[in-house]
Amino acid sequence: MNIPHKRTGRRSHISRMRRSNYKWIYLFLLPTFVIFVLFYAAPIVQVFVTSFTSWDGFNPPEFSGLRNYINLFSNNGFLMSLKNLFFWCLVAATLHVGFGTLVAFVLYQKPRGWKATRAVFMIPNVISAAAWAMIYRFIFNNDFVVLNNIIRGVNPEFNVQWFYQSPWAFWAVTLTWLFYAVIVTLVVLGDLMNIPQELGEAARLDGATGWQFIRHIQLPLCRSAIGTSVICSLTARIAMYEQISLTTAGGPGNDTMSLSILLVNGILDYRYGYANAVGVVMFLIGLLILAVVNKLFRMDESDY
C-alpha cells in the first residue's frame, strides 16, 4: 500500500529538481538575453522606426512616412548600388566560393607542402580589410602603377587608371576581396577532414571512382560548410565599406557605389532617417540571402 506513495514522492522530487535546474538555466541565460535586447534587438527596432522619420541626430525625430524610402528608390546611386551588389554577390557565390572549395579539395589530397599552404591561408584572416585595401591601392595607384608596369611588359601601350576609369574601377574593387576565398578553403577543408575514413573505404569497395566519391559523398557532406561560406561571402558584400571607401569612394560616378557607402554618407550629412532606411534595406536583403541559401543547401538537415 505504501508503494504508490513512494513513487509519487519520487516523481515530485524529480519534478522539483527539474524546476530547480530550469531556474539555474534561466539565470545563466539572463545576462545573454539582456545584452541581446539592449545591443541587438532594441537598436534594430529603433532603426526600423526612425527610418520613417526626418532626423538629424540632434533634434527629435519627426514622422515623414515613406519619404526616405521614396527618395532612396529614386536615387540613382542607390539603384546603382543594388546593381553592383547583385554582380558582386554573383561573383562571390560562384568564383569566390567555388575557387575556395576547389582549393580545399586539392589540399585534402595532402600534396607536398599542404600544411604550410594551410598556414599561409590564415594570413588574410588576421589582416584587416582596410590594410588590404591600402595594399591594393598601392598596386593600382596611378603614381606607381605596379600592375600597369607588369602588363606593359606584354603590351607597351597599356595605360589604365584602375580606380578612376569605368569599367575597370568595378573589377579593381572586386579584386580587393577575391583573395578571401582562402578562408572558404579553410572552412570547407575542416569539414572534409571530419568525414569518416570508413565512408571512403566503403565507397572504394563498392567500385566508386574518385569523382563519384566527391560528387555523391564529399560534396553533400560539406554542404553546410559551403552554405555557410556562401552566406558569409554574400553578407560581407552587403556590408563592404573599407575596400570602397579607401579606393574609389563609390566612383567614378556611381560605378562602385555600395549600400554601406550610401549609409555612411547619409550619416555624415546628418540625414539619420535616410541612413536608417538604407540600413533597413541592407537588413532585409541579408534576411533574404539567409533564407534562400538555407533553403538551397538544406542547412537545417543532418549530414549523417
Where do the language-model regions lie?
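A structural signal for multi-pass alpha-helical bundles of membrane permease subunits
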Residues: 21-304
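Short, Lys/Arg-rich, polar N-terminal cytosolic tail immediately upstream
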Residues: 1-19
